[in-house]
Amino acid sequence: MGAGVGVAGCTRGHRNWVPSQLPPREIKAGVSLAVVTEFAWVLAPRPKRATASALGTESPRFLDRPDFFDYPDSDQARLLAVAQFIGEKPIVFINSGSSPGLFHHILVGLLVVAFFFLLFQFCTHINFQKGA
């Protein structure tokens, strides 16, 4: 074994490096990762602390209701109240009276035509010869 090499074929740049040991820069990264992980666990909220902090504070009554912001779009009074609350001008959609039937028929017709076109392309380009 040559001088300056701790393990045969080791070219990690460290004189006495052993494969089971981390190089010094990787040790620093591992230690800092362990410190950050431990620090994160210290800062994570615990159920005891969460319930203790929740006891002293009260949320507004309307936030606890199960139907908070759960209302149909047809309820214009609530829509206007929410728009006023968030400071926006409300948008009111009106029914124009035209039915979506024509557009629906055109769309379905185009899809059927596209399907038959792809089927035609497949059938004309497939080769039914044996062994081909």
UniProtKB/Swiss-Prot annotation:
Q: Does the keyword Membrane apply?
A: yes
Query: What are the annotated GO cellular component locations?
Result: plasma membrane
Q: Which residues form the signal peptide?
A: none
Q: Pfam families, per this entry? A: FIMP (PF17672)
Q: In which tissues is it expressed?
A: Testis-specific.
Q: Membrane-crossing residues?
A: 100-120
Keywords attached to this Swiss-Prot or TrEMBL record, sorted alphabetically, are:
Cell membrane, Fertilization, Membrane, Transmembrane, Transmembrane helix
Q: Which domain of life is it from?
A: Eukaryota
The coiled-coil regions, if any, are none
What is this entry's stated membrane topology?
A: Single-pass type I membrane protein
* InterPro entries per record: FIMP
Asked if Transcription regulation is a keyword of the record, the answer is no
GO annotation terms (biological process)? fertilization; fusion of sperm to egg plasma membrane involved in single fertilization
Location within or outside the cell: Cell membrane
Task: Report the function annotation for this chain.
Answer: May play a role in sperm-oocyte fusion during fertilization.
- Name the chain's protein: Fertilization-influencing membrane protein
Print the organism lineage. Eukaryota, Metazoa, Chordata, Craniata, Vertebrata
